[in-house]
């Protein structure tokens, strides 16, 4: 199965990239502070825990995000969204991944989930994407579909902050 959009991998170097004809998404959420919070957040993002804790179905060909891993996200038990991991990053202060849409996904585009620890020790989650409607129901949803994408991105931050709360108190 091939990707349903171009340019594949565009988010790797620039999380704010948005090619012509796509809608941008960029949500940054403060998760906490310190190395323990960063390590916990990175693991939760790389091992699908954040997504599973949100109540979405994750069917992946590997237990951890890695390039070329296929992932199908199921929303509300009904909407299946097949994707493939394009890139991952695991550095001392930055960890995460991005996937691109495959045939059958209601949208086409790319989405990244990146945890970073800034110089002052603050840990952030950035959810960044560029997308446009692919299916008839995503097109019919128009602005409401984009609103749901933003709500999902904000919820990622809330859920990850909750998952990291124990690490913040250690």
Where are these regions (language model features)?
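A conserved amphipathic terminal alpha-helix motif
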Residues: 132-170
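Short, intrinsically disordered, mixed-charge
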Residues: 39-50, 104, 120, 158, ...
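Hydrophobic side chains in beta-strands
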Residues: 29-31, 73-75, 87, 117, ...
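Residues that form or immediately flank small-molecule/cofactor binding pockets and catalytic motifs
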Residues: 10, 90, 132
